[in-house]
Amino acid sequence: MTSESAAPLFIFTQPEVLWYTIAKESRRGALSRVRQESGTVELEQAKKRVEELRAVIEKNNRLYYDQDAPELEDFEYDALTRELKELEAQYPELVTPASPTQHVGGTPSGRFAKVTHAVKMESLLDAFSYDELRDFDRRVRDAGIEPEYVVEIKIDGLSCSLEYENGELVRASTRGDGVVGEDVTANVRAIKKIPKKLKNAPEFLEVRGEVYMPHEAFQHLCAEQELQGAAPFKNPRNAAAGSLRQKDAKITAGRGLSIFVFNLQQCEGRSFKTHHETLDYIKSL
């Protein structure tokens, strides 16, 4: 390792990865994990590291999206994903359609009917430093746009699409792999905090948001699980995802779930100039 690297903060126990170091917050820090003392990263070394990263990330994706039980903490997963993105950026020839950087979400479960999204459900782009944030702003302005930013809180739960016809909730679906998700309409209808009818709504409306479990509800659920001798959920995100994807809607109803709506995806007969306008419109419904 180079003198610029930080001390190891954690060790992976998975056989496919011997160890991994979080370096200082800089772009060259991530690459220092595969950099030789001469400062040159050989293609074969990069290819090997890319394959290791993809294996661990894909494994965690399956656990995260399909079983709601990831092994990695969020900061560990983010660090691995960031390293993979940087290696692929430096070596474009290593990018493949199957890479986890080229798609989002997981495979829809066989427990629920499948739903094909009319508009693909994408994931957010990450920024881990002020430099990356400034770089994003520069790219926006270089495209001839003078932006006014809307800053929202980031809530970790399960992404969900809600579709309304004439103000009535007709379908709710998870993101799945971004193209095909799971039909969780019955469970969403059991969540008190999600409106089943909207006033003054257009003929068709689709909003997207994050179904989450508030900390108070999470603590209550964990206490109940411990009393019953069951293993408690690892964190509120896993609890929210596991609760929403229950086969019995009555279980979902008792979990205290809520939703944070962050996007107006479709709105028949209406048009908006800014994201802020769409949020104001959603609040009016």
Cite the ranges covered by each PLM segment.
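Serine residues within intrinsically disordered or low-complexity segments
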Residues: S3-S5, S26, S32, S38
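Serine/threonine-rich, low-complexity intrinsically disordered segments
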Residues: E4, T13-P15, A23-K24
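Intrinsic low-complexity, disordered N-terminal segments enriched in polar/charged/small residues
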Residues: L9-I11
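Intrinsic, low-complexity polybasic segments
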Residues: Q14, G29-A30
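RNA/tRNA-interacting regions in translation and RNA-turnover enzymes
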Residues: L31-L285
